[in-house]
Structures are given as structure tokens and as C-alpha cells.
Amino acid sequence: AGGTPKPVPLRDDLTLDPAVVEEAITDDTAMFVVNSPGNPTGAVSPEADVREFARIADEHDVVCLSDEVYEPFVFDGEHHSPVSYADTDSVVVVNGCSKFYSMTGWRLGWVTASTRRIERMLRVHQYIQACASAPAQYAAEAALTGPQGVVDEMRETFEKRRNLLLDRFAEMGVEVPTPKGAFYAMPKVPEGFVDACIDRGVIVVPGEAFGDGGAGHARLSYANDTEALREALDVM
């Protein structure tokens, strides 16, 4: 759409600093993106920061696009959305079934926004994709209206795996900003760590794949079987 991304640095705990976001805004800024709980970091924005994101969007008349696909997977504290604190329609929320219900391959998500913004999105959307498939829509309806206990079980399982990962990295002497949500971690790793893991059959992603700020880190996903995670940690 002709936009130019402008990366901003994260804090040491890998959360997004509202002050840094606001400082980066210019007259040409149309939108900034918030992702909490986050991929690739697992970071969760505290409520005070989320309130600030809403204020920034309101006062600067820019869109805050809040990616909340990992919403149910918060281990420490609660999930907060900037749309809850906005005084205007400057916050747009995207979400989906991929993470909530392990429906990644079904490709079904949604946008929550004001009527005027949805109408503008539809002008583009209708020429890109006619609609989500009928089976995906029926499956999503069943997931959204059915018992949610399975989501709670997933969150509890992810938290146990996170704790396992943190304990093992502590034993290794590797620094890991504590992920408070999603199912990712980004430890600080020595040079050659990623290649060494891959050579030994453990898939990790170099932090640089997510931008210059990821240098010196590796992204790990613990959305895997616990025993497989133990084996991977043994290799590391």
C-alpha cells in the first residue's frame, strides 16, 4: 500500500515502549502496530502501556493496529486491549482462530473496528478474497460457541512448558527475558548457536529474521510435545 515500515527498539524485557512509539510518529505516520502477547518475543504489554497506546492513537490521529491472536495465552497478569481505552475509533483489532483453537490451517480471522473503517477495508478485501470457506466458518462457529475449557488447558500446558524452558536455560547460564504469554521465547545466545542447533536437528530461528533488534537472540517455540521440548533442550 506504499507504506514504509519504521522499526523501533524494544525494552530489555522485549516489551514495546509507548514513549519510543510516540517519539517515532511524524506527520506522515498512518499506523503503528501493537502485538501483545507477542510473536516472536512472548512479551505481554502491561495495562499502563496499553492505555498509552490508545492515547497515542487518539491524540495523533493515527491507527493503532492491535494484533491479539494470542489473547488467551497470558501467564502472568491479564490481557489488555487498547480498544478498551480509546476515546476514538483509532484502534483496530485483528484476531483469529489459529492460536485459540489450533486452527492455523483453516485460515480464518476477523477485524474489530468502527463501521467506517470496516467499509473502507471491504473495498479492498472484496477484490482480494471473496470469503472464508464454508467449512472454516462452521468450524469457527463451533469453536467460539462451544466449551472453552480446552483453551484453558492449552494455556496451562504452555505455561508449564515455558517454566521448563526457563529452568533449563537458567541451568545453562543463558539469559532469557521471561515470556509472559504466547508460546515463544527469545534467549540471548552466543554466535553460532542457531547453526549448531539446526545441525543437530533442533529448529530455532535466528533473531535477525525479525529485524536488526533481534541480533544476538534466537526465537524458540514451545508449542510442541513436552518430551520433544525436553529432548531439544538436552541438545541445546
Regions found by a protein language model. Give the residues of each.
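PLP-dependent class I/II
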Residues: 1-236
